[in-house]
């Protein structure tokens, strides 16, 4: 199958995330592939219709649904109407070329449309097989590099209309040489991590072998710990989050008591470490979420429970909900009455409550004076 390689350089809120490389099925759907290729290179210049560059550059992924797809390619509509625009290199719309290829696996490129023969520039990347789209949307390529970036996008926080809260942007795009060799799946990202973003995307992990899964999670967790010790907090949090996602996606049956104990221990360690790093990064909501996950682990011991409660309470201080922080830190103090860090956190929560109430009293007094 003839396949032109093209790429997106993806950023999230201005922070580079990496490169996603696609191969286009030129010989199966040449017209559709040529449209996407030109919108990557921008070689058609300015649209006489919209006055916008015929290019994906600086456009965002406006609709993302976990376990389904990531959609983008609308570079003509205003920000509050994304998903209603887009334009092909042939004019506004063009016909469905053919439906020879099916949506039978994740990481396929397919045309978004509003009905038969309404293809423009909008596209989507599948993240699971989507056979219900066969015969309705034209498959024209697939991801051959950067699958982990697609997975991060897929799992990003969403707001209204399934739009990512943060702007996942195509910061740059273009065409690669015909003989381009994609970076091998699971290539080291510079930290020693050679695993895909999602557990089931790995060819090197036997999902039916608990020891294989535990070894991968432990390796990712250890990389997170090393990065934490080096002061690389963002990268450390990224690795703990990745380890957590592996555990959240793992639903084994019939584990031995020993394997169950290992699973629970890994969950506790990863969740608690994620909460710790989130606090260091001043990410209160993330710290609370990670601590809550730790508290839900079966057979949690008192020492771990105390840590989780403390980190949850400090997370609430960061989000300025000191009343909730006080309640949780008091619960932690009951488990460990002599813990200086908990005592200090509780004092901070009470002090902040007093400051806010004093400020409110002054404001009310001024209002009625």
UniProtKB/Swiss-Prot annotation:
CDD domains, per the entry: cyclophilin_ABH_like
GO MF, any single term: unfolded protein binding
Chief location of this protein within or outside the cell: cytoplasm
Key words, A-Z: Cytoplasm, Isomerase, Repeat, Rotamase, TPR repeat
Positions annotated as TPR repeat: 217-250, 268-301, 306-339
Catalytic reaction annotation: [protein]-peptidylproline (omega=180) = [protein]-peptidylproline (omega=0)
Top-rank EC class of the record's enzyme: isomerase
Pfam families: Pro_isomerase
A Gene Ontology cellular-component term: intracellular membrane-bounded organelle
Domain PPIase cyclophilin-type: 7-175
Gene3D superfamilies found in the cross-reference section: Cyclophilin-like (2.40.100.10), Tetratricopeptide repeat domain (1.25.40.10)
GO terms, biological process: protein folding; protein refolding
Subcellular location, record wording: Cytoplasm
SUPFAM superfamilies in UniProt: Cyclophilin-like, TPR-like
InterPro entries: Cyclophilin-like_dom_sf, Cyclophilin-type_PPIase_CS, Cyclophilin-type_PPIase_dom, TPR-like_helical_dom_sf, TPR_rpt
Entry's EC annotation: 5.2.1.8
Family, similarity comment: Belongs to the cyclophilin-type PPIase family. PPIase D subfamily.
Protein role: PPIases accelerate the folding of proteins. It catalyzes the cis-trans isomerization of proline imidic peptide bonds in oligopeptides.
Protein name according to UniProt: Peptidyl-prolyl cis-trans isomerase D
Source organism phylogeny: Eukaryota, Fungi, Dikarya, Ascomycota, Saccharomycotina
């Amino acid at each position: 199958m003839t396949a032109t390689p093209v790429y997106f350089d993806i950023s999230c809120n201005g922070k580079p995330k990496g490169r996603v490389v696609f191969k286009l099925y030129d010989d199966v759907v040449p017209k559709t592939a040529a449209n996407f290729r030109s919108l990557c290179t921008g070689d058609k210049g300015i649209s006489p219709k919209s006055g916008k560059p015929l290019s994906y550059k600086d456009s965002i992924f406006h609709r993302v649904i976990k376990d389904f797809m990531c959609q983008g390619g609308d570079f003509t509509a205003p920000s509050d109407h994304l998903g209603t625009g887009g334009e092909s290199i042939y004019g506004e719309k063009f016909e469905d070329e053919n439906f020879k290829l099916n949506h039978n696996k994740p990481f396929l490129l397919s045309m978004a449309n509003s009905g038969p023969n309404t293809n423009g520039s909008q596209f989507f990347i599948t993240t699971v097989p989507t056979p219900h789209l066969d015969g309705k949307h034209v498959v024209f390529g697939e991801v051959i590099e950067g699958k982990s970036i697609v997975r991060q996008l897929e799992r990003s926080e969403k707001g209204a209309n399934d739009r990512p809260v943060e702007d996942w942007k195509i910061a740059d795009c273009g065409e690669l040489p015909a003989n381009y060799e994609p970076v091998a799946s699971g290539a080291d990202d510079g930290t020693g991590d050679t695993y895909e973003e999602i557990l089931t995307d790995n060819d090197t992990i036997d999902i039916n072998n608990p020891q294989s899964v535990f070894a991968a999670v432990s390796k990712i967790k250890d990389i997170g710990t090393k990065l934490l010790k080096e002061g690389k907090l963002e990268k450390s949090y990224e690795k703990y989050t990745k380890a957590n996602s592996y555990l959240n996606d793992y639903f084994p049956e019939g584990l031995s008591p020993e394997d169950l104990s290992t699973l629970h221990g890994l969950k506790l360690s990863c969740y608690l470490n994620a909460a710790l790093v989130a606090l260091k990064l001043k990410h209160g909501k993330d710290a609370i979420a990670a601590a809550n996950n730790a508290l839900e682990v079966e057979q949690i011991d008192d020492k771990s429970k105390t840590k989780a409660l403390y980190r949850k309470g400090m997370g609430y201080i960061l989000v300025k909900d000191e009343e909730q922080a006080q309640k949780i830190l008091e619960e932690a103090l009951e488990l460990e009455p002599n813990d200086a860090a908990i005592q200090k956190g509780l004092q901070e929560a009470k002090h902040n409550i007093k400051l806010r109430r004093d400020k409110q009293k002054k404001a009310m007094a001024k209002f009625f004076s």
